[in-house]
Amino acid sequence: MSFTDLGLPEWLNESLSNMAITKPSAIQKACIPQIMKGKDCIGGARTGSGKTIAFAAPMLAEWSKDPCGIFGLVLTPTRELAIQIAEQFTALGANMNIRVALIYGGVDMVKQSLELQKMPHFVIATPGRLADHIRSSGEDTIRGFRRVRYVVMDEADRLLTPGFVPDLKTCMDLLPDPSKRQTLLFTATVTDAVRALKDRTGEKGPPFIHEIASDIAVPSTLTQSYLFLPGYVREAYLWAILTHPDNEKKSAIIFVNRTQTAETLRRMLMALDVKTASLHSEMRQQERVNALGRFRAQAARVLVATDVASRGLDIPTVEMVINFDLPADADDYIHRVGRTARAGRKGQSVSLVTERDVTRVTNIEERVGTKMEKYDLIEDDKVVEEYLTPASTAKRQAVLDMEAENFGERKRIQRKKAGLDVDMKSKNKKPKRVAKGKSDKK
């Protein structure tokens, strides 16, 4: 089956061909015809299976018949994913003079407001920043959203979590009634919150649902491995894995749970002559864009990232994912390892497991449906003799440099302004007593 068979116009087939996309994936075969028939859609598929094309292609096909106003809105949880989706829309619509607006935090709101007033054809946004515009930027900025034909929630399982819901509701309340627009939800993990939406049928009847079987949560081309080790030697083993002859030319993403760890590992690996970039919330937006650009261009072989990079980012060259820290949620593990073994390619994941992680490993294996294999490429004696001291020295210097630079100060200031300050210096101080009868407002 070809994209022509799915009913896409010739100009769009040419754009797909120029992007080296010639055969539709399972989710594209299932969803594109149904969306073009006007149905709402819930699309669940493994990461790397082409979900973005599954909603972008039919939207663009319909837009080309009447290219005016803000035709479609795509909501997504992270800036990086928003940028990637916008790039795909721009590439697909390059021959049709498409106008795509990117709306996310960390850049000037006035500039974004002016861009929205020009009525771009498609808006790719994070809910928080779009909600800010709805609340404060005025009617000229937001009026185009009152007539959108499509709204997409990409990584819908994440958008429907409590942290996003208030801003998401603000965005959705501005849009036309569901009976007057198409609503498309796409995700790699179809949660109960996503699945519950199928019962809200309304006038249009039930949505079309394409859902993967739960027993194939990760690609069959992915090899999942683990290394059981003491926590204090993880850095040495990480360096040993990355520089092993079998891996020294592979591109890799290292996932961690904290921004502090991400920056520490980046500096440590750079000191050990491993070209490394990092991606975490402590970085300014342009720094994040530059880091991703370096990694995509292979100027950096390794990317150290928090879960900001675990969802949706399509970097085809990633051959290995290393979980330096295991995530608490098994679905987050699925999203992480899904950065490799994409679109039928082979890939490998290695999880560094300490004694505290055993329960997490068990939960992950139950969710994924397969056991991790022991990673036996690294010799313990060699790590102790050759890697432990240099890695420890490089890590110690990285920590000292970060302390001297007040790393994390910007975030602490932001949290303080938001009333969420956690003063690291006062963590060990006893709380002040409050006089009887006085309130203790935070």
Swiss-Prot record:
A GO biological process held by the record: rRNA processing
CDD domains: DEADc_DDX49, SF2_C_DEAD
Cited InterPro entries: DEAD/DEAH_box_helicase_dom, DEAD_box_RNA_helicase, Helicase_ATP-bd, Helicase_C-like, P-loop_NTPase, RNA-helicase_DEAD-box_CS, RNA_helicase_DEAD_Q_motif
Motif Q motif mapped to chain: 1-29
Enzyme class, broadest EC rank: hydrolase
Domain of life: Eukaryota
Alphabetical UniProt keywords: ATP-binding, Helicase, Hydrolase, Nucleotide-binding, Nucleus, Ribosome biogenesis, RNA-binding, rRNA processing
Binding positions for ATP per the UniProt entry: A45, R46, T47, G48, S49, G50, K51, T52
GO-annotated cellular components: nucleolus; nucleus
UniProt domain Helicase ATP-binding: residue ranges: 32-208
Predominant localisation class: nucleus
Any matching Pfam family: Helicase_C
Annotated region (Disordered), positions in chain: 411-442
Domain Helicase C-terminal positions: 237-383
SMART domains listed in its UniProt record: DEXDc (SM00487), HELICc (SM00490)
A molecular function GO annotation: RNA binding
This protein's domain notes: The Q motif is unique to and characteristic of the DEAD box family of RNA helicases and controls ATP binding and hydrolysis.
Family named by the database record: Belongs to the DEAD box helicase family. DDX49/DBP8 subfamily.
Function: ATP-binding RNA helicase involved in 40S ribosomal subunit biogenesis and is required for the normal formation of 18S rRNAs through pre-rRNA processing at A0, A1 and A2 sites. Required for vegetative growth.
Name of the molecule in the record: ATP-dependent RNA helicase DBP8
